[in-house]
Amino acid sequence: MRQQIFLIAFLIFVGGCVSYHPEPLLPGKSADSLESRKIDDPGLRLFLVLHGRKPNHWPKRSWDLADLTLVALYESPDLYVQRTFVDLSLAGITTAGQRPNPSFSFFTALNSIVIAPEETSPWALGMLFDLPLETAGKRGIRIREARNLSGAAQFQLGQTAWNVRSRVRRRFIAYVHGIRQARNLEKEVAVRLRILRLWQQRYRLGESSAIKEEAARIDLERARLLLNAVQEQEAASRVALAQAMGLPEKALDSVRISCSDVDKAPSADLLPVPSVQRAALTNRLDIREALERYAASEEALRLEIANQYPNVHLGPGYAFDQGDNIWALGFSIPLPILNQNQGPIAEARERRTQAYALFTALQFHVMGQVESSLAHYRGALKTFNTNRILLARQKAYQRMIGRRFAEGEVDRLALLDSRLALLATKRNHLAALMNVQKTLESLEDAVQVPLVGSSGRGQDPSPRKNLNRSPFHDHRSK
């Protein structure tokens, strides 16, 4: 019977142990997996559906900024790394909740002094147990601290997801801007080529000098050089966009990108400035992460204060000595005589003060970032509106020149010059629009709330409507 009990206890002990399973890292296999990523992944389609972007066709025929952002959230290696930190923090909660294991010791002793009968062995056999008992609620304090640190890791995951979104938006805007500028410059090159041919024709007819022809040729070559530079930037921004999405550049070969999102910009008057700043100061992801870390420092201080009270160790034991059964029960505690844990308490208190100072400094930085971003956005929007008015006037002027040309009042060279002026105004308009999008992106980064809805109007960034939702989850299996 006793052997069966020992066998059952041994099996329970072995069954509770975790076995080691090797997971070798193969660089070649990992590289193949990264290079084979495609935008028509069935898992990505399910991810889009879960986020309310159910495609009518698969693969999608057109991808807008919202779609590409979801692709990045699905594929991003940065998010995968941060999820491992979240999983590590969750494991830390398990570690914090563990109770100390009891210990068992066995001993033998030889009693050579006492004269015992011949049939009595001089050897004594015994065993001791050590049962540690934590006091002052230390286990609960450790669990709360670990939960606060896990909460900070989860907010850091959200911060990483926001950074992924921001990076995709920034590179998407740069890519679209490059496409539009290239198209505009292609038209300018075509117009300047026609102007050069007109001057060549006039020079052959003796109606102009070679200086005019050479100046037109220089202007044409300058436009071509600028076009080459813009096309190079466009290609580089395409690669950068693919990298921001966690895809190889070739994955975008069959992707048709919708550029309509770039044209959306809310009026500064539509932005609820008090709500914007308040939301940033109280609900930004890094603010909430700092709050969790401060709460963890509070629990760490509480734990060090609790460590003033020593843990108790119960020590029941049994010995068999020359036919006598000896039972024992004792306990031990460390004596807080030489120190009462003053050093660790002082360190924990200063760490809490440091966490408070870091939180206050972060809030001040956020406040300045929001105010600066708002000022830059208003200025960029004012410049953009001025360029938009100028573009409308330039279009009207070009139409007037077209009518005059049709009536024979101006020559073709004047018509082409008006087209060049219109293209130059469009180039300035595109640059102003790019600047608006950049400053809007900076403002959104300052608040960490999307400020443009599908209608292009400003959104209320109150935490009740936006920030209490948690859009960043682990959707990609490991």
Predicted features and spans:
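C-terminal structural cap/anchor segments
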Residues: 344-386, 390
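Metallo-beta-lactamase
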Residues: 230, 285, 432
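Small/polar, glycine/serine/threonine/aspartate-rich low-complexity segments that form flexible
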Residues: 51-61, 93, 105-135, 142, ...
